[in-house]
Amino acid sequence: VIELVWAYIVVNKDRIAALEWKGIIHTDKALTRDFWYYTTPVLCASLVWGIAFVLYSVILGHMGSDAVAANSIASIVKSMVQCVIRGVSAGAGIIIGNLLGAGKLDKARKYGGRITRLSIAIGIITGLLLIVVAPVVSRAAPMSDTAKGYLGFMLIVLGLNLMGQSVNTTVLDGIFCAGGDAKFDMKGNIGAMWCFAVPLGFIAAFVFNAPVWLVYIIISLDELVKLPAVYIHYKKYIWVRNITR
């Protein structure tokens, strides 16, 4: 609520995108059509991603209370580190979208490369940071020794996974969406999560009763599995286009 009120004040004060009841009630049909055309794949991608993560929790829940406890703390630590990645992704979308909307396609393409390289560096830094603090966090966590062992391993896996996630999040959610190329994010989530991580995770946990460490690696590989496809699609430069009217 506080964030909503603050956003309303800033928007109307600086006239960035003034909110008017007339514009809310009487919408432009062409704009509404474009809005749903470009945002529906984003919503679907988020839905696919969210449900998959719920199923990850179901898989780990089958592995026992120690695995659940370790995953709970690992997820909190991961969310804290991800703030940096999400910030870069949001900034990338604004910068690239502004350039594309202004018709500066060559400059947008150049900046896209720079931002992608920046995301690689941030992924390496945040990933290594998470790996370094893994022993400290696992020792300080109020849980059983078995759960602490799981937690330390999970944080290391998450650190390695963040290196790929940084690039994927920046490119998919930032650069691609700025150019209206949001369908690939949905396809990537379906392929990496629903055709790989989720089914293999369920088979490993429920059919073969695999150890926690192996199951966790399987359900954490979705970002790395998706990375080559993201790079190939990025180099096609389909996202370098002006979608404004």
List the model feature ranges, each with a label.
Residues 1-7, 86-89, 158-178, 184-196, ...:
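Short runs within selected transmembrane alpha-helices of multi-pass transporters and secretion channels
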Residues 1-40, 96-161, 204-245:
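Short alpha-helical transmembrane segments in multi-pass integral membrane proteins
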Residues 42, 46, 54, 58, ...:
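Transmembrane alpha-helix boundary and packing residues in multipass membrane permease domains
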Residues 5, 51, 55, 79, ...:
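Transmembrane alpha-helix boundary/anchor motif
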Residues 66-67, 182-183, 211-212:
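Membrane-helix interface segments
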Residues 2-6, 24-55, 59, 80-84, ...:
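Hydrophobic faces of transmembrane alpha-helices in multi-pass small-molecule transporters and flippases
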Residues 70-134, 166-185:
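Small-residue-rich hydrophobic transmembrane alpha-helices
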Residues 47-80, 98-99, 136-145, 207:
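Helix-terminus/linker motif at the lipid-water interface of multi-pass membrane proteins
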